[in-house]
Each structure stands twice: as structure tokens, then as C-alpha cells.
């Protein structure tokens, strides 16, 4: 979310939160009339005006466009690969967005296909024993499945903890100017040089 807001200052960015429990309605303090579940309904129907439908669902926070995430976990977990592929192709080929950010949770085997489509993958990691073991298991599975290309484009990031210093009423906007925002800007600066 912070990365998207920072990039959106210079480029057209669409943020898709694919987590089962995103907390977006609570975080932003409002209900959304349509969300990613509705968009996938149109994808499954083979709607020819998919980008037009999508544009009607777009919400914006701090210059960052996003489609509100699903409300129920099953809505994201039951999306077929063909539907993911069609949606992403439509966005890449027929929308005005230069950057598409997928904020992924844990949605099953489709995650690996989505990761294969990404140019860059940032993986937040922790240094505690259990977290390191989980990352190692993930990496080993990628090797077993011959998905080393995912590993090659993955950068592990140790994000600074930032929760305590940001007021709840403007949390999302304040992320950009938090310690996390500084960390992301430095990460992008290093990538560009």
C-alpha cells in the first residue's frame, strides 16, 4: 500500500489487495459499493466491457487507485486461473495503468502463477525462527516445482515496524511519511541506480 502511494506520485498505479482478510473497509472507515468479487463476476460472465466495469469500481487514496478487496475469503480463494489471467491481461492491454501492484496473501496454487507473471516481487520477512523456517519451506517448494525464476525476481525486505506512531484517522495517507515510507523510497532509489 505504501509502495503504491509513493509510485502513484509519478505514475498511473493500480493496487489490488488479494488477501483473504484485508481490513480495508475498517482501515478506510467506509463501505464500498463494489469490490473485487464483483469484478470477477464480470470476468466469469465474459463481459466485453470489463475495463469500463472495472473503472466504475475504482477508488482512490492519496493518488493511488485501487479496487476494493473481497469481503469474504472464499471469493478470492475460488478464482480460477483463467479468470486471473483474463483480468490481468485486460488491465495490462486495455487500461491506462503503468504499474499493477498485487498485494498477495495466501490463496493457494494460483499464487505461484501470479508470481510468475510479476516483474518484481517484494517479500516482507521477519528474522524469528518460525518465520525463517516458513520462508525456507516456500523457497524449497519453488525449487521442487522448478519455479526458480520466482526466486530470482524476489527481494526479501525487512520492513520497519510503524504502527505505534501513526494516528488511526489518517493511517493510509500517513504511511507515505512514516519510517516505512522512508524505507520504501530508499528501496526504490537503490533499484533505480
Language-model features: locations:
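Phosphate-binding loop that captures ATP/GTP phosphates
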Residues: 10-66
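Cytosolic-facing regulatory segments adjacent to core modules
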Residues: 46-60, 68-104
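A structural signal for short coil/turn segments at secondary-structure junctions
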Residues: 8-11, 95
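Glycine-rich phosphate-binding P-loop
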Residues: 1-9
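Short, flexible/disordered intra-domain loops and linkers
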Residues: 27-28, 32-33, 75-78, 169-170
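Conserved catalytic-core segment of NTP-binding enzymes
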Residues: 86-178
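Conserved nucleotide-binding/hydrolysis micro-motifs of P-loop NTPases
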Residues: 20-22, 71-74, 107, 129
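NTP-binding/hydrolysis catalytic cores, primarily Walker-type P-loop NTPases
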Residues: 170-193
Amino acid at each position: 500500500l505504501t509502495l503504491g502511494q509513493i509510485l502513484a506520485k509519478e505514475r498511473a498505479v493500480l493496487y489490488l489487495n488479494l488477501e483473504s482478510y484485508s481490513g480495508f473497509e475498517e482501515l478506510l472507515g467506509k463501505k464500498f459499493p463494489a469490490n473485487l468479487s464483483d469484478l470477477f463476476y464480470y470476468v466469469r460472465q465474459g463481459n466485453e466491457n470489463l475495463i469500463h466495469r472495472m473503472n466504475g469500481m475504482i477508488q482512490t487514496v492519496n493518488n493511488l487507485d485501487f479496487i476494493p478487496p473481497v469481503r469474504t475469503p472464499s471469493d478470492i480463494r475460488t478464482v480460477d486461473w483463467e479468470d486471473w489471467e483474463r483480468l490481468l491481461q485486460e488491465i495490462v492491454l486495455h487500461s491506462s495503468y503503468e504499474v499493477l501492484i498485487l498485494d498477495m496473501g495466501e490463496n493457494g496454487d494460483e499464487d505461484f502463477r501470479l508470481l510468475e507473471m510479476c516483474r518484481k516481487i517484494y517479500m516482507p520477512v521477519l528474522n524469528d525462527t518460525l518465520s525463517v523456517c516458513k520462508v525456507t519451506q516456500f523457497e524449497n517448494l519453488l525449487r521442487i516445482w522448478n519455479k526458480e525464476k520466482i526466486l530470482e525476481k524476489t527481494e526479501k525486505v525487512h520492513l520497519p515496524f510503524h504502527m505505534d506512531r501513526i494516528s488511526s484517522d489518517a493511517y493510509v495517507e500517513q504511511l507515505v511519511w512514516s519510517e516505512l515510507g522512508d524505507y520504501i523510497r530508499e528501496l526504490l532509489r537503490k533499484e533505480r541506480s
